[in-house]
């Protein structure tokens, strides 16, 4: 029987405001426990929440970027539940009328197991503002749990999709695209290790695309793309095996154990009525006029999809290259700076180098591209020397770029080429003389080539490059050899 997987994601993106959503306390990460909790965060008597304008503007920014409707009037609600790290006994969230409604996000799903990749549009249900809870600390307290309220009141944007994804690969592609977008917009730092971006996955299975949805289980607080994929794949197998063995899937909340690579039951899954939502009487309705939306729209950066399309049309880049270069804002900025210095004619070469040598060296060094030792202008200088034939692409990769990366001669390609004596031979008369000598010394290879053995030609090219100590232009060597051998 062909089972279909149904997945929806709820993502909590911590908004990059300096202060909390309803108080003036700092949102900085890593402070000593309970040193960044204002009276509002502590739920002290008589204090009232004041909405952070910056959090609202970041929500509007996100809504505009995904083509959503921005609600002219939205309501904050109290989500009632008890937990030790929730001092008020309720969380301020949005329920019936969220600030962002609808929207879409187009994702690129990687091909796997010989299947091609594809593009898919995921529909979003909503994105709403809410406050984060505190944090329970279980380490260093013998038989007890500590409570840190520094995180309480931190502004979150909860982003909810429709159940549109049909595999773990699609869910990961969506999560990666969303992660890249919120960082591109500057509304979230995307630091998954610090909990700034975490996903809950709602997973169910059904007997084919026309069958009713199955009972879903929610897997909470997945803070890496690898964990997200592993958790979904395990949960899908668990549900299918359970049903095929005659059991029934129970609606519940589950946690993922990355060590055992399995999900386990945490609690029965609550429905909305369990939280007894009602409008927060301490907060007025949030009114967002067209002028405010237009003001935020004016600050929007060029979005990744639009920039990728521009790279394709302006520079003739393949779609794959354009999508890789616009995966992060820093990579796109680096590419554009290289092209600005090297010229549009070198755009494809710039893309190849950034996706190749630059990316591999960054990965080995554990660096982001904005910390690359080779600047865009320096890389453009190297590309210019390849383009004008001063050095070959191979010499650039093998000898010049590593020296630039190491900071030799201040990363100046020309100085490194001169110091190492890497300039290609430009005297065609001298090269022709060397090729004559190579042909005379390799009569057997000449005979084999004339007998139709193409490998013999490659051997002659190798001998010519060896004789010039790699300084000859390979294309010029090929051209002269063919001319001498009568194969041109």
Swiss-Prot record:
Main EC class the enzyme belongs to: ligase
One annotated GO molecular function: glutaminyl-tRNA synthase (glutamine-hydrolyzing) activity
EC number(s) recorded for this UniProt protein: 6.3.5.-
Reaction catalysed by this enzyme: L-glutamyl-tRNA(Gln) + L-glutamine + ATP + H2O = L-glutaminyl-tRNA(Gln) + L-glutamate + ADP + phosphate + H(+); L-aspartyl-tRNA(Asn) + L-glutamine + ATP + H2O = L-asparaginyl-tRNA(Asn) + L-glutamate + ADP + phosphate + 2 H(+)
Keywords: ATP-binding, Ligase, Nucleotide-binding, Protein biosynthesis
Family indicated by similarity: Belongs to the GatB/GatE family. GatB subfamily.
Subunit structure: Heterotrimer of A, B and C subunits.
Name of the protein in question: Aspartyl/glutamyl-tRNA(Asn/Gln) amidotransferase subunit B
Species of origin: Ralstonia nicotianae (strain ATCC BAA-1114 / GMI1000)
């Amino acid at each position: 029987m062909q089972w279909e997987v149904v997945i929806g994601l709820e993502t909590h993106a911590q908004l990059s405001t300096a202060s909390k959503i309803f108080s003036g306390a700092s949102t900085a990460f890593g402070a000593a426990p309970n040193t960044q909790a204002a009276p509002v965060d502590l739920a002290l008597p008589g204090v009232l929440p004041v909405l952070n304008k910056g959090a609202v503007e970041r929500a509007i920014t996100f809504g505009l970027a995904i083509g959503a409707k921005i609600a002219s009037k939205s309501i904050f609600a109290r989500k009632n539940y008890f937990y030790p790290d929730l001092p008020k006994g309720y969380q301020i969230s949005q329920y019936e009328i969220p600030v962002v409604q609808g929207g879409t996000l187009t994702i690129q799903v990687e091909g796997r197991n010989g299947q091609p990749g594809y593009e898919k549009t995921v529909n979003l249900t909503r994105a709403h503002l809410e406050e984060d809870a505190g944090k329970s600390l279980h380490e260093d307290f013998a038989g007890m749990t500590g409570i840190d309220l520094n995180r309480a009141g931190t502004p979150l944007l909860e982003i909810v999709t429709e159940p549109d994804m049909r595999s773990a690969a699609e869910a990961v592609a969506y999560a990666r695209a969303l992660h890249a977008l919120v960082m591109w917009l500057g509304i979230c730092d995307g630091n998954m290790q610090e909990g700034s971006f975490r996903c809950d996955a709602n997973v169910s299975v059904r007997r084919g695309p026309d069958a009713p949805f199955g009972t879903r289980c929610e897997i909470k607080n997945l803070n890496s793309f690898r964990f997200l994929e592993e958790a979904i794949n395990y949960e899908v197998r668990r549900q299918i095996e359970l049903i095929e063995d005659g059991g029934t899937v129970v609606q519940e909340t589950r946690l993922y154990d990355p060590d055992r690579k399995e999900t386990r039951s945490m609690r029965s899954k609550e429905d909305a009525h369990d939280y007894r939502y009602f409008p927060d009487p301490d907060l007025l309705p949030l009114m967002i006029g067209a002028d405010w939306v237009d003001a935020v729209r004016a600050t929007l950066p060029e979005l990744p999809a639009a920039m990728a399309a521009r790279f394709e049309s302006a520079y003739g880049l393949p779609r794959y290259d354009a999508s890789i270069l616009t995966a992060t804002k820093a990579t796109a900025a680096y590419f554009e700076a290289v092209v600005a210095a090297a010229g549009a004619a070198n755009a494809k070469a710039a893309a190849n180098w950034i996706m190749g040598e630059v990316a591999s060296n960054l990965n080995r060094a554990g660096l982001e591209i904005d910390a690359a030792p080779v600047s865009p202008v320096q890389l453009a200088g190297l590309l210019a020397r390849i383009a004008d034939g001063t050095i070959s692409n191979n010499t650039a990769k093998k000898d010049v770029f590593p020296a630039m990366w190491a900071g030799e001669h201040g990363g100046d390609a020309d100085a490194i080429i001169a110091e190492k004596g890497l300039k290609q031979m430009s005297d065609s008369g001298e090269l022709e003389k060397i090729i004559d000598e190579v042909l005379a010394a390799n009569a057997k290879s000449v005979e084999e080539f004339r007998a139709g053995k193409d490998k013999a030609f490659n051997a002659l090219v190798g001998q010519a490059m060896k004789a010039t100590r790699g300084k000859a232009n390979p294309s010029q060597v090929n051209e002269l050899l063919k001319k001498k051998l009568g194969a041109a």
